[in-house]
Amino acid sequence: ELKGFMTTNAPGILGQGIKMAQAIGADTVDMDQIQIHPTVQYDSASLITEGLRGDGAILVNTEGKRFIDEVSTRDVVSAAEIAQPGSYSWLIIDQKMVDESSVIQGYIKKGYTFEGKTCEELAEQIGVDGAALAETINTWNGYVEAKNDPDFGRTSFTQALDTAPYYAIKVTAGVHHTMGGLKIDTNTEVLNENGEIIPGLFAAGEVTGGVHGANRLGGTAVSDFVVFGRIAGKAASDYAA
């Protein structure tokens, strides 16, 4: 089912740790649970921070229309994006956002953005209908002013997209995190298929499963590997002593 999906993870992350542990009897959990991130740059597989949507960006499809509450959960936004023509969308931002964000400025330097002095000019750059895109942006700006999105129920209205030039980044959904992995106990000891500890084998971080359930919350992987990493390090040290 994942054939053709890109991933934000490093090329060297291929599940080797899980395979090595399985070779000596380790059990796994939640191996069917993955997290898809909706804003992965279409050509490079680079993660485009969701902070842009929180700061006011919108997503439009190939018709130049919004199709989802952009700040909904990653799985919901990704599913809506995958259902669009071509399974991709355009992340729309304006100059005001660019001026306020070194991150966006970095995206521009990397060549991820298309630019237009007007909504219609940007639409021409990205191959969507100019009138439709202009109407979408104008409508969205009205929603921001009214603090109400009757189309999709978005409740985040940080700022309007009203400062030219306008920019677009082509994004698609990509595998961002795998919730499944080695089954461990609270001391980070890896368990076998009978639920028994495998002596001397400890694991922490994304190689493990059962920590995040079916869908990881943004940012919690950091607390996962920091907390369980420290526990695993101390436990391994105590075991070796």
Model region roles, listed by residue range:
Residues 8-11, 47-51, 82, 171-175, ...:
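Short Gly/Pro-enriched turn/cap motifs at secondary-structure boundaries
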Residues 66-89, 192, 198-206, 210-222:
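Gly/Pro-rich active-site capping loops and adjacent beta-alpha segments
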Residues 18-132:
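An anion/pyrophosphate-binding glycine-rich loop and adjacent beta-alpha core
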Residues 12-19, 54, 87, 113-121, ...:
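Conserved active-site and cofactor/substrate-binding residues in soluble primary-metabolism enzymes
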Residues 62-63, 186, 193, 227:
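Short, ordered coil/turn segments that flank beta-strands lining enzyme active or ligand-binding pockets
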Residues 132-215:
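A glycine-rich dinucleotide-binding beta-alpha-beta segment and adjacent secondary-structure elements
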Residues 22-29, 65, 124-131, 135-146, ...:
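Generic secondary-structure signature for well-ordered alpha-helical cores
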Residues 1-20, 169, 208-240:
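A conserved FAD-binding loop/helix module that cradles the flavin
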